[in-house]
């Protein structure tokens, strides 16, 4: 049911936001897929690519959209943040896609944002993010910290009785911004500095033994 709601919302947005104008004279409506198929983020983003292709096939089996078939155009930004921007420009300018579904990390989203705003194209961003950003060219489908992280802290504090906290994450914008918000929230709730541990690791880190031991 949830997948159907997302699918319906997606196609409705395509219809009402004006992207059908570009598609009117084309044989297909092009959907850009900007997810890493190689590198560190491939384990997460490949699944999103597969999901988009499945939804495109399902929609085409149901007659397409606006009387036209959808055509997925897939590129691989390879978990390389500057390459995300290059591939976004390629999809919009060269491939002439009508909309793009892509990114996972906030650093990749921030890398492509100037491209989407410059070329006035639309990005569907699929996961939670740290907030503190809004653009008419991005459809943010995930939760911000006040919708996800803060309620989790409230549950752990009030229902589980957690007293000591570890704010861990990969060393980039989403964990750092979210943890900054959480740290301030915990302190406002009376948690002492000594009971808050903050730790960041690089992408691809796999040795968690020392962190757990601490």
List the model feature ranges, each with a label.
Residues 44-66, 181-188:
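Short, polar/charged alpha-helical segment
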Residues 86, 130-131, 137-214:
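Extracellular/periplasmic Venus flytrap/periplasmic-binding protein
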Residues 1-30:
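Short, low-complexity disordered leader/linker segments with a strong preference
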Residues 28, 43-50, 63-132, 202-209:
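Beta-alpha junction/loop-to-helix N-cap segments that form part of ligand/metal-binding clefts
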Residues 32-40:
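Acidic/histidine-rich, surface-exposed loop or edge segments in extracytoplasmic proteins
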Residues 22-33, 62-69, 157-163:
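Immediate post-signal peptide segment of exported/extracytoplasmic ligand-binding proteins
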Residues 36, 77, 170:
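Cofactor-binding loop segments of dinucleotide-utilizing enzymes, especially the Rossmann-like FAD-
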